[in-house]
């Protein structure tokens, strides 16, 4: 048996440098309640590690048709582009690592097939700015995404190092950001037309 615990790369201590964070990078679990709860999950896993084989997957920003919770950036922009007259973002400069849901699932399956136990980062190993994502939404929706240019909370740049994941599995993402966002955008459009969106889907 193997237990998999999903936490977050937000555990890593923020820094101004553009170097990616590997699994040995120092953590800061006291950023907020969400991050601290993930830290507690990891501590429980460590306590039982000798009796329960486990993997701790520190996830980057996973997006896709079934990841529709606000205030996550991509689902929020898509929802607003369908239902609002104006679309805006807090600031277009921050860069984060975004991974499509199907790619994340493939990576998880690939890792299960190994004998590895311990911590591993889950992401694409590359960053994309909020501005670049806004441009994709503009092309799909025909609506301009306004930059409010407000002060950014948190680091401007956050990337996880996925070298360990690749070394263990050889896994690489199949979907580009454009492809993943387009698939998500179209699926949410179908749900909207079928009266399943936004209330029944976005709040689930």
What is the predicted role of each segment?
Residues 1-31:
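Conserved Rossmann-fold NAD(P)-dependent oxidoreductase catalytic core, especially the SDR/UDP-sugar
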Residues 8, 59, 101:
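Active-site loop/turn elements of alpha/beta-hydrolase fold enzymes
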Residues 12-13, 32-33, 55-73:
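Flexible, glycine-rich beta-alpha linker
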Residues 17, 30-55, 82:
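Active-site Tyr-X1-5-Lys
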Residues 30-42, 67, 71-75, 97-98, ...:
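Short-chain dehydrogenase/reductase
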Residues 40, 44, 48, 77, ...:
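Hydrophobic alpha-helix immediately C-terminal to the catalytic Tyr-X-X-X-Lys motif of short-chain
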Residues 81-204:
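C-terminal substrate-binding subdomain of Rossmann-fold SDR/epimerase-dehydratase oxidoreductases
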């Amino acid at each position: 048996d193997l237990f998999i615990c999903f936490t977050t790369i937000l555990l890593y201590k923020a820094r101004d440098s553009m170097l990616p964070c590997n699994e040995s990078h120092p953590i800061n679990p006291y950023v907020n309640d969400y991050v601290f709860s993930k830290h507690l999950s990891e501590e429980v896993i460590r306590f039982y590690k000798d009796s329960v084989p486990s993997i701790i997957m520190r996830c980057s920003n996973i997006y896709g048709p079934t990841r529709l919770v606000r205030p996550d950036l991509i689902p929020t922009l898509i929802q607003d582009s369908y239902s609002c007259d104006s679309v805006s973002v807090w600031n277009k400069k921050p860069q984060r690592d975004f991974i499509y849901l199907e790619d994340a699932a493939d990576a998880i399956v690939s890792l299960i097939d190994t004998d590895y136990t311990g911590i591993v980062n889950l992401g694409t190993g590359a960053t994309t700015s909020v501005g670049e994502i806004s441009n994709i939404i503009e092309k799909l929706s025909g609506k301009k995404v306004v930059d409010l240019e407000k002060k950014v909370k948190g680091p401007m740049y956050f990337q996880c190092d996925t070298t360990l994941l690749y070394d263990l599995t050889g896994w690489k993402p199949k979907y580009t950001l454009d492809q993943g966002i387009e698939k998500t955008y179209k699926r949410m459009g179908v749900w909207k037309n079928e009266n399943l969106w936004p209330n029944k889907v976005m709040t689930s």
